[in-house]
């Protein structure tokens, strides 16, 4: 009572553990002691339907949460507090599982068709959940501007659409341009972006692919690329966040917005707590000259997938077409462009000199090479931001 509605995915996360346990135990008649023994057997591997070496405490916690929900709702002999609950300690993510630039490129090369490469790059460069990717419609994506919005009609996105502004496609832009050449029907904007692979059989673009299809695609890519690290959709989500924080130092709220978490979410302090420690040590060693700084960007390709121009290691955007590869570059570019628009609003149209200054800056930023140089120079970007702020204050 008073808890409000729950997403279908959340309900399923409770139902599945209950269904599993109900195969061996009558949950209506079970005692608290019996349930504790069952949970212990899961951990040691003695319980049916689990692997021989057992399951981790973090997984057993899902069963504990489901049981507590069940017994809180039903008035049986077992109370919710009779079920122990393992505490969440540390990050569930192993930093060693994060993909290197070379492994990202291996995975991309292993995707042997345009549809599968589009799926992979959407997961890699947006950090979105599988459900969000498979339900994107053509009208949710602006290829020209390299942005997308989540489909607001979809249930099960865990509130991600509550902050549903434009998000960057980054390196997925060129891949999607290529995929749309093969898409079965781009005339209807209501059609789904990702469809079944075009073949001799008819493809219905008005129906989304199954979540299992996305999992299978990443599994096949992992196998063909010979990558030992996790490559399932949720692992790629963790990969995106880790890179955004570790390599590009994006603010927590920016990262949470990009992946669809609420502003007050604690995900950065829990799931991604592994981003402290070793990463801070590495930066300190670089500052003192003990360690050579990394000059490559994990999300920067060797060749731009929009215009096929060779890209310098560590470049944030293509010097020829202006395609943005890294999340920090997109944020910086968006800040400058927003500042220019605000300057137009705040400036008196009769103030010819100021209008000419703003137009000159806007024209310069249309040059991809100039924009790329600006994005690589943090001091210049800071000065531009300060100038924009001063101009808005003065007006």
Regions found by a protein language model. Name each.
Residues 1-95:
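N-terminal core-binding DNA-recognition domain of tyrosine recombinases/integrases
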Residues 101-131:
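Basic, Lys/Arg- and aromatic-enriched nucleic-acid-binding interface segment
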Residues 141-143, 229, 249-271:
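Short, polar N-cap/turn motifs at the start of nucleic acid-interacting alpha helices
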Residues 237-261, 357-360, 370, 380:
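C-terminal catalytic core of tyrosine-transesterase DNA break-rejoin enzymes
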Residues 282-395:
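C-terminal secondary-structure termini that scaffold catalytic or DNA-interacting sites
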Residues 123-145, 251-254:
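Short, charged phosphate-coordinating catalytic segments
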Residues 155, 259-295, 325-327:
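Catalytic-site neighborhood detector that most strongly recognizes the C-terminal catalytic loop/helix
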Residues 66, 70, 144-207, 217-225, ...:
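Basic, alpha-helical nucleic-acid-contacting "clamp/cap" segments
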């Amino acid at each position: 009572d008073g808890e409000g509605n729950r997403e279908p995915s959340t309900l399923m996360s409770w139902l599945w553990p209950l269904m599993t346990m109900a195969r061996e135990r009558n949950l209506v008649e079970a005692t608290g002691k019996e349930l504790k023994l069952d949970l212990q057997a899961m951990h040691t591997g003695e319980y049916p339907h689990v692997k021989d070496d057992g399951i981790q405490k973090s997984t057993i916690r899902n069963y504990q949460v489901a049981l507590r929900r069940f017994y809180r709702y039903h008035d049986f002999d077992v109370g919710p507090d009779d079920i122990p609950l393992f505490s969440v300690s540390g990050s569930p993510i192993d930093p060693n599982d994060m993909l290197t630039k070379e492994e990202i490129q291996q995975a991309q090369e292993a995707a042997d068709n345009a549809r599968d490469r589009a799926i992979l790059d959407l997961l890699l460069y947006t950090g979105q959940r599988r459900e969000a990717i498979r339900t994107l419609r053509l009208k949710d994506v602006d290829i020209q501007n390299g942005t997308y919005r989540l489909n607001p009609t979809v249930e099960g996105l865990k509130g991600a659409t509550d902050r549903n502004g434009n998000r960057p496609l980054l390196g997925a832009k060129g891949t999607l341009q290529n995929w749309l050449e093969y898409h079965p029907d781009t005339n209807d904007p209501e059609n789904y972006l990702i469809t079944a692979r075009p073949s001799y059989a008819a493809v219905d673009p008005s129906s989304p692919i199954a979540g299992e299809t996305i999992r299978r695609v990443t599994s096949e890519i992992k196998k063909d690329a010979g990558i030992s690290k996790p490559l399932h959709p949720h692992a790629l989500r963790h990969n995106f966040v880790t890179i955004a924080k570790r390599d590009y130092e994006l603010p927590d709220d920016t990262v949470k917005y990009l992946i669809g978490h609420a502003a007050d979410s604690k995900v950065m302090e829990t799931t991604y707590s592994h981003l402290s420690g070793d990463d801070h040590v590495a930066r300190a060693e670089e500052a003192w000259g003990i360690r050579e700084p990394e000059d490559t960007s994990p999300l920067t390709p060797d060749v731009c997938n929009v215009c096929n121009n060779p890209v310098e290691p560590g470049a944030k955007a293509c010097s020829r077409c202006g395609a943005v590869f890294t999340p920090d570059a997109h944020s910086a570019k968006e800040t400058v462009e927003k500042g220019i628009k605000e300057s137009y609003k705040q400036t008196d149209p009769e103030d010819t000199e100021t209008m000419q200054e703003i137009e000159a800056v806007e024209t310069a930023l249309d040059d991809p090479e100039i924009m790329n140089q600006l994005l690589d120079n943090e001091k210049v970007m800071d000065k531009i931001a300060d100038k924009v702020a001063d101009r808005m204050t003065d007006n």
